[in-house]
Amino acid sequence: KWNIDLLYNTHYEQNRQTTDTYSHHTLKNNIYDICQHNDIDRKGITHYVRTGAEYKFNDNAHINLAYTGVFNPNNDNHSYSDGNITTADNRTKKEARMHNIALDYLSGFGMKAGINYTPYHSESHQQFTYKDNKNQTSEFHTTSGQTIDRWKIYVDQSHTLPREWTLNYGTSLTYASDHNTQFYHTQNGTDMSELNTDNRYNEYTYDFYVGFSKNMGERLSFSASITGEYYKTARYHAWAAYPTAELTYVMTPAHILQLAFTSDKTYPSYWDLSESTGYISGYEEVQGNPMLKPSTDYSANLNYILKNKYIFSLAYDYQPDLFQQLAYQSTERLALIYKTLNWDYQQSFSATTIIPFKIGHWLDSHVTLQAEYRQAKCNKFFDLSFNHSKWIGLAMLQNNIILSTKPDIRMELTGLYLSPSIQGSYDLNHIWAIHTGIRWNFANQKASIQVKANDLFNSMEGNIDVTLRNKGQYMDMHTNNYSRNITLSFTYKFGGYKEKQHKPIDTSRFK
């Protein structure tokens, strides 16, 4: 039996952001007060297409071939910076395309196998003009590109054993080849060729895992697995193990305990691993870091579920080698450098309570309260270090409201508040947000019209204050990002159609 599906959608996005930066910059025992105002406009269109063909041998075995394409034909980015030491005009045009071909097979005896190939290419052109406080003008043009070829092959096997045991094991091999280039072309005679970069990067990741699960009667269930990984690049290679375990104990139907431990790894983007330098303004720049390492995330969670409704959780999260991009005021020149570096670690302890409640048949609500202690430590941040910690609070109320049953009109209303928090050496202000939406279901629940408004008051990303005070580093930044968005959608289901869920293609490491 054959099944064939085809999906196409397109997405246009326009974003506006303003940033005000006040930098109290210490350089060679002198202090420079630098003020910069940046206006940034971004717009672009994305086309997404997917087609797949599946052949079912029987109910338990099938083979599937799928193609996915994502195309960004024209993304424009224009930023204008005005300050007391420099003004700059920065225009960038970018286009990108990604293809993915995946072949997957599921046997009738629990084996899964597959291979997929992902080629990706992007190129951008930047026109940069800046004028210093002496009215001297400089111009340059950059061309940059990224070409990635990624292959993955995997085999998984699952066995159902006697006495309610389940055994799983498998292996996978991923190879990625990345080619990053950036070339500077000056337009006023200044030689900038020392900033040109042409980097090739090969990455090998080999994984193998084994796991099992067991139901011990009606009250106790347990599962565990361990993944071994060998990761290799030209500058870094290491073996690592990632265990997971989960235990569920049903004391009574009204009292359930869950204990879980997980571990995973996060890889830096391929562009961050390049040696490139990009300019935001005449004062701000972004540098790559070819010495970046993957980070690991270890998490432990204890949940107590009361009456199948109320949830009380304790969690601990430890992330060695966590990498994030932070700003640094150079001690060698007047430059604010943004660079992604590995920290020693970030860790957090948190306690969470989720309380649902209903009022009649028209209101179904959930209250979430969380208290978190977060610590970020880095002993080698350029020529500095930081050890930053803070208590953080989160409160969220989610409401599902039935406005009418005939006609069927429902409303969603969510509000959240996050207290002042930290990011590395930064202090961040509090944020809050309101999300809402209304849905009308009709035609015997086959059709619906929905209007949604996210961040209704533009308060979540529209009013961010960043404060840096660390061993002579002194900076204040205010960012206003237009994050409010309103969507209108119409859905009609033909017959018994159910939308298929497809595993998304991982593009998180692409530029």
Regions found by a protein language model. Name each.
Residues 2-9, 46-74, 89-238, 243, ...:
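Face-selective signature of the C-terminal outer-membrane beta-barrel domain
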Residues 10-14, 69-73, 117-123, 173-179, ...:
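Transmembrane beta-strands of outer-membrane beta-barrel pores
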Residues 16-32, 70, 75-91, 123-134, ...:
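Outer-membrane beta-barrel translocator domains and adjoining extracellular loop/strand segments
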Residues 34-39, 84-91, 136-143, 190-198, ...:
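Extracellular loop and loop/strand-boundary signature of outer-membrane beta-barrel proteins
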Residues 201, 265-314, 318-320, 336-350, ...:
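Outer-membrane beta-barrel signature, preferentially recognizing the C-terminal barrel domain
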Residues 344-420:
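Gram-negative outer-membrane beta-barrel transporters
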Residues 395-442, 447, 454-466, 470-474:
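C-terminal beta-barrel architecture of Gram-negative outer-membrane proteins
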Residues 442-511:
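C-terminal beta-signal and adjacent terminal beta-strands/loops
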